[in-house]
Amino acid sequence: MEQEKRIFSIDWAGRPLVVEIGQLAKQANGAVLVRYGDTVVLNTATASKEAKNVDFFPLTVNYEERLYAVGKIPGGFIKREGRPSEKAILASRLIDRPIRPLFAEGFRNEVQIVSMVMSVDQDCSPEMAALFGASLALTISDIPFEGPIAGVTVGRVDGEFVINPTVEQSEKSDIHLVVAGTKDAINMVEAGADEVPEEVILEAIMFGHEEVKRLIAFQEEIAAQVGKEKMEVVLYELDPQLEAEIRQLAEEDIKRAVQVPEKLARDAAIEEVKASVIAKYEEQEADEETLKQVNEILHKLVKEEVRRLITEEKIRPDGRKIDEIRPLSSEVGVLPRTHGSGLFTRGQTQVLSVCTLGALGDVQILDGLGIEETKRFMHHYNFPPFSVGETGPMRGPGRREIGHGALGERALEPVVPSEKEFPYTIRLVSEVLESNGSTSQASICASTLAMMDAGVPIKAPVAGIAMGLVKNDDNYTILTDIQGIEDHLGDMDFKVAGTAKGVTALQMDIKIKGLSREILEEALQQAKKGRMEILEHMMQTIREPRKELSKYAPKILTMQINPEKIREVIGPSGKQINKIIDETGVKIDIEQDGTIFISSVNEAMNQKAKQIIEDIVREVEVGQIYLGKVKRIEKFGAFVELFNGKDGLVHISELAEERVGRVEDVVSIGDEILVKVMEIDKQGRVNLSRKAVLRDKKEKKGKRPERHRMKP
């Protein structure tokens, strides 16, 4: 039977939010078309009928960009969308993170959410429409989702918070924050800010959560009318009898193993206990399912003991205090031929960041749905398998690496000098050499050091720290500088980066259903204390950016010309500019306002290129005398080059004061002669005279200075 199309609407930050259900994608478990202004996103939620034989919840979120949404045809030879853009990957992660905690423990059915962006109004965020639509598609479906959730963007313009700021408002905003959650609590935060105090960030989060509650009420109203009955699923459970056996067998050994301070030794101790228990069951010829359960029960025991130690005894696996940072070390100038490098080590987490400076022509070209076309500041994060002592394939960046790179970029961007102040493209690459948690924050610290070593005049150094949480009912403990095991077995990964003045980036992921204001406030203040300690350490390594760039970095010379002269500098089909580049070996970037950036490692070549361009755009002035070179001789006169690209004609009658029979009697090709500009005609032709120069000289010579007699 044909399902009836239903339409629901609400005002969202001054723009209409319209939801259509029942017409499109009806074979999915849940499907919602969201119209937010002129932004249109089709959201579907689909689940497998049977549970998968895996030890995790198999959720996949795909945020699919279609370039037709902004009236573009994809570039390149193939002319169709390929792998997801960086922005699409970040949007997929943004949707995944608040939704994932809201499925029951033990739910192992595969779930896929697809958000297909079909039309984009730049003032109505497709990411926010997709987040809303993904939650609603799950809520009205028969998939056992414990939502709904919603998310909003919060900006701050002239001291006032704004929900879902427009493009114009975003340009003026000093906060760019996304907050998501349920009606009772916050479960995801993603933010960039211009050194904003923690108190303001907290208020922005709570302001956004009020709007989240309103959107959730709207979803509940829709679900009450069109929602399906939830499917019955069998949740994966551990065998209680087997669990009791293993507790008796291994609990004491695990308690000792998790308190080994050093990561590799601790991992080895835990693995030894696990191997011993599994070997006993293998001797009993236990089947594959039993062995799988044995492994999961052992993991559960490790998790319980780590959490118990932290919440009850305030003891961490490596013996640190709750708010203690691991030992820090850092250095700069590690690599001799790079433009700048910084090595930052925190415990067993180590990152080497390298800064490379390029010309403005080296900017990244963006081919996506946003209004930005280029990017001059980039931060790339790499996580090779050897960093955790493992082998593995060396592929291109995955979702996690792209996400960590973007977080670092967002944290550092507020302190990067403007194009006008520092006309360079800046690329940072963070290589994770050792990992035991908080690598994304270590990459921020190492990148700050690398930029300072490169001589980038950053406004202030930035440091990052990751906070953790272990929560059992009402009893909770916030951890400073979490390591891998605390991240893996804890309830929160709360990353905060900033300067001494305030926060520049923030990212919060949790595994529980939500957090209260009190926990958020405490975590932010504890993070600030830790950040200040790390900044103090970094300042001991390098106090300020180097005054001079590396000798291997390009030197950029800036000049300004009349915009109407740009065509002359470029020349037909780029002939003129390519000639300058070939002759000098420089890179030349020209802005529409006539600003020209000339860059090369050789400063002398920069000056040579500048002189050539100045000659091209230089105007010939009537009445001025120039030293020119004879380039061509005709019967009627000589063509003289005044400067590069500018010729004029000295008619035979203007070559000398006396009558000239043949031009060659007075000048030859290659001669340098003084000429005066007599006229520039309507066609732009320049008429020159040598005779006028000779006459002027004669007149000056003929003038005698007046003699004044002394009075008696």
UniProtKB/Swiss-Prot annotation:
It comes from the Bacteria. It holds the Pfam family RNase_PH_C. The keyword Signal does not apply. It is found in: Cytoplasm. CDD domains: KH-I_PNPase, RNase_PH_PNPase_1, RNase_PH_PNPase_2, S1_PNPase. The keyword Manganese does not apply. It comes from Geobacillus sp. (strain WCH70). Belongs to the polyribonucleotide nucleotidyltransferase family. InterPro entries: ExoRNase_PH_dom1 (IPR001247), ExoRNase_PH_dom2 (IPR015847), ExoRNase_PH_dom2_sf (IPR036345), KH_dom (IPR004087), KH_dom_type_1 (IPR004088), KH_dom_type_1_sf (IPR036612), NA-bd_OB-fold (IPR012340), PNPase (IPR012162). This is Polyribonucleotide nucleotidyltransferase. Residues 554-613 form the KH domain. SMART domains: KH, S1. Signal peptide: none annotated.
